[in-house]
Amino acid sequence: MGAQYSTELNKYNNNNNNNNNNNNNNNNNNNNHTISGNENLNNNNNNNNNNNNYNNNNNNNNNNNNNNNNNNNNNNNNNNNNNNNNKNNGNSNSNSNNNNNNNGINKYSNYFESLINNTNKDTNIPNNSNSNNNNSDRDFIQNMIKSANQIKPGEKELVLFHKLHQSLKENQSFSIEELRNSSILSISPDKSFLTNINEINVNNNNNNNNNNNENNKVGVNGSSTTTTTTTTTTTNNNSNNNNNNNNNNNNNNNNNNNNNEDDEDDYGDDDTIENNEPTFVDKPNKSAKLQKPKLKSNLNDTNGGNSPQQNGKISKYMAKKLLALQQKQLEQEQEQKQQQKQQQQQQQQQQQQQQQQQQQQQKDAIENINNNNNNKLQPIVKNSVNKTTKQKKNKTTTHNVKQQITFLTKSDNEDEYDASDEYIDDDDDDDEKYDDDDDEYFEGNNNNNYKKNNISNKSKNKNNNDESDSFSESEIFKQKKLNHDKNQSNPKQQLTSHSEFDNSLLNKNQSRTNSKIQKLQIKEENYHQIQQEHGEKQQQQQQQQQQPQQQQQQQQQQQQQQQQEMQVDKEQTEKIINTNKKEEQKPNDYFPPIPTNPFKRDNETAFGKNNENNNNNNNNNNNNNNNNNNNNNNNNNNYRNNKPNGEGFLSNLKIIPPMISSSPYYSKKSSNVVPTSPKSNLSDQQPPFSPVQISPQKQSPATTTTTTTTTTPTPLKKQKKNKTNNNINNNNINNNNNNNNNNNNNNNNNNNNNNNNNNYSINNINNEEDEENNSTQNNNNNNNNNNNSPQNSNTNSNNSNNSNNSNNISNIVSDGYQWRKYGQKNVKGSLHPRHYYKCTFQGCNVRKQVERIGDTNQNSTVYKGEHCHGFPQTTRVVSDQQAFRNSVMFEGLDGNNNNNNNNNNNNNNYSSNSNSNGNGNGNGNGNGNGNGNGNGNSNGNQDQNGNSFNDQNGDSPTQHGQISPMNSPKNTIPTTTTTTTSISTYVNTNSTNKKNNSKQEKKISVKNETTDDDEFQEDIDQLSNNNNNNNNNNNNNNNNNNNNNNNNNNNNNNNNNNNNNNNNNNNNDDNNNNNNNNNNNNNNNRFNGTSESKGSKKLVIETGSSIDHLDDGFFWRKYGQKSVKGSPFPKSYFKCAELTCPVKKQVIQQDSKYINTYRGKHNHDPPESEAIEKRKKHFNGLYNNNNNNNNNNNNNNNNNNNNNNINNINNNNINNLNSLNNINNINNNNNSNQINNFSGSIQNNLKNILKEQLKEAGKLHNEIENNLIDD
């Protein structure tokens, strides 16, 4: 504030000049009265001016020059007019005796200073003889002085300024004339002087004033805020600084005030002064002339708008505004000048080009005249020469060049034409048009030229647009007559003149036409060139515009791809996290919580990328039975080497405990399949030890969820829900454990079987989520476990070949709900149709779409809507659905789940000669293949294909002459889709003769069918013997022990736990006796019976329970179903399970009723009551074993008794603990410390889980007993 306050004072008192001029003693003393320390403030002002690029020092020197000039000019009046001269150096450089040079408030400023310095209140105000409003000015100032008499001397000048500023602010609506005639004062931009607008106008009568203004027109530029203007003022006056300073030092005794007020450089802005107005003057010169200033009309606001005030100070608002306006006006003037110069240059260039073109045209015309003198044309003069432009357009020309001439000359304003004269060639007699224009024709006696009148239709009829510009015929013939009259005296001369006249006309016309043709050709070329250049420029501009657009599009595409990838990753991770959280918060009855692994690492698998190495090591183990331990260690090292930090191969392992139920058909909540592409790296897929279970959640109608599954069209053997064999070989680590146990402990088979059980427990969930990856590794366990068998080289090679053909079923119905298909639609660009399904629950509107993704093996599923119900309850009679899935072709699905099981069974039958004993662990097809009746008396035999069967003492479900459904030729089917959802239950009907009245359905041609018992038996076998295929070869060396132990302990399941035999084998003895042999005997008896069916051919029966429609005394096999219009329940089709029986039936559900329609006659006896009871036991046992054995991965046959189920769970617990011990034994060779810690945590988790499973098994046992009682 202090610096700014000092600048305002110094602008009035010019303290900067006082510091620069050492002779101004009086003014310096007087100024010291205002504020103490004023010199310091002046120094601050100098610094501020330097920062603002104001060169005050240079300006002061320039002003000193002006003072010297003024003194020289006014030597006669120095004593009388010191005050006036001292205050007028900025704008008027000389003073006359009349005091005409008064600039604004400068005449009052001396009075203010004298008032302050001398405190003389009665001093007269100076007069201005030339001003019209002296009285008003004097009164104005006197009134202000009277009001300021009581103020101290140091504050008077501030008060005056403040009051003047307020008066300006109050009078903002004055016009220009009022401002000129009033005493309102304006503010200078730089020094804050108040100038009276009336007294800016200066008379032109003083010659000295006119001479002194030319070199002093500095105006605003003298003290502008820009550096360029200030430097110009200093450079212009540097030559006079030395002399002027000396003069000032000698002559400043009487003129101290002159030097003090020299800095009145700038008072206004060029924007407020017209071109004929002068800028405010600083430097007087004798040769300068003073101009009359005229203010523009934009000075309505003398205060410069809302200028801020602080403590009575006058701001620089108006000064800045005026400066900005002046700069804008200067820039506009410069731009106008530049535009004018450019226009002039362009006009000059155009004129030069026109002149050059005219010269060229003249040259071309002369050359054409010389070249075409020999061509002669005969003119044909017509009566009507002048024609309108409309008639010209209607005329046609025969020559193409002439057409171009007429067309182009019409568009040209300079070259006007007339096509009125037509000429005919002597040779072709073609009509041609030529223009006459304003050319002159000359004729003479000697020069053979005829002069033609310059009068044309154009000159005569300038205002008529319809008349042409050609010459009239009358004028031409008048000249001809005149010439003819002149030459009548000389007939020879007359003849020559006529001939010369004709020749001259012909030559003239021809030269004109040729010249015009050339002009037109030149114009055409120029036009084409310009058009080409313009087209090229446009193309370049378009390319330049398209390049950034293309780049932007590429960048946007890249960003979108990245965003999509990120979104996919986020969605997958969110699904994984959400499902894990939900499972932890709300565990299913059949799915206990999964223990988390602290050693798990993201984006890695337990395998790394060494699946190929694992297979190679397994082959080495098969070839080198004595060195299995070394090979296994190599496998472990391979796992370890794939880790980036060299960590243990189990650092990323996530163990999943054995589950009670993993089948979507029997579980309350099933899991969706996590999509994995077959060609993707293992590092990008879900690790096999950490499968992700995504339970189907209730979905809102606005949202859709998609799941992708993988299927491949391969031959289908027998479609079973059992998928355990495919999942055994995911855990290559446990396979290595099996190798070690087999090689080190040939007599101990418990560890081998236990390890296999652990594989089941880990991989059941993988079976539903990573089926494709699991299916590619199906035969590793077979290779590993067959080390000790002498005949396993063939079986291993066969298994390796069959593993490529094994693919899992990506079941459409595996989401836990029941669906029916209501249509399909072809997809553009794809060979596979899109299938549409609807939930079968009554009132539920949920739909889903299933579609094959491109040429890949993935199916995408899209759900729409939200289920209004829970998961449907599973049926008690599972065989119906199992039979359907085993016999009916799936549309769009590949049911090759059990190919490996079949091949393994067939291949392993070679080793069943030494292993067929009462253990039930034979390698035949089905659990009874190669097994005795449980007493160890049967001898397993083999057919030519390696399929084992029994002699008379051992009954097998695969009889001679029968083909197993698993090996039947019907199982190779194409790829289609279906919805098999509704679950049928039994109906108790005692009728034997039943008919069918429904529509005929498509039949599946099957040469050889199996009995329903065979199917159920195979279901049990698939649950139990998948690991038996892997373990029986290991038991080859222990046949003696197995025979002895099993013969002694047929009924005691737990007596052989301490022996080398498997606990599972002991449990399987009872199962084989109860489930396999007796059923097979009953089935064999049915072939010899006679049919007892009587009655009509067609029978319809209505039942009221959901259980009675299948339990009618016969065994049925479901072969299809169909959706019914207007009903949420489908129609089911069944066929008698006997091979040769033609009886069929249809079942339609209507709310709580079931309508059964039978057709045909049975050609066999009904099954005995014992078989029916055993069949019920099969159903119950299959249901229980599917929930217990599959998820716990027992290698046992399904048990019908609840005690056997509990024993199986106990055995599996022991097996799991043994498997952990085996893992510890192997890993102690490599990373003992790490694996021990990890295994300890796993054991604790498994113990807790197994306790929970035991409780759940007890609950299941109670539920089964209650259901049996109800039945």
From Swiss-Prot:
Ranges of Acidic residues composition bias in the record: 260-274, 413-442, 1011-1021
DNA-binding region positions on the chain: 808-872, 1105-1167
Annotated Polar residues bias: 1-12, 297-312, 488-515, 672-702, 957-966
GO biological process: regulation of DNA-templated transcription
Annotated Basic and acidic residues bias: 475-487, 578-587, 998-1010
One cellular component term from this protein's GO annotations in UniProt: nucleus
Gene Ontology MF terms in the entry: DNA binding; DNA-binding transcription factor activity; sequence-specific DNA binding; zinc ion binding
Residues forming coiled coils: 9-71, 320-372, 520-574, 766-786, 1013-1040
Pfam families registered for this protein in UniProt: WRKY
Role of this protein: Probable transcription factor. Interacts specifically with the W box (5'-(T)TGAC[CT]-3'), a frequently occurring elicitor-responsive cis-acting element.
PANTHER family attached to this UniProt entry: WRKY TRANSCRIPTION FACTOR PROTEIN 1-RELATED
Protein name: Probable WRKY transcription factor protein 1
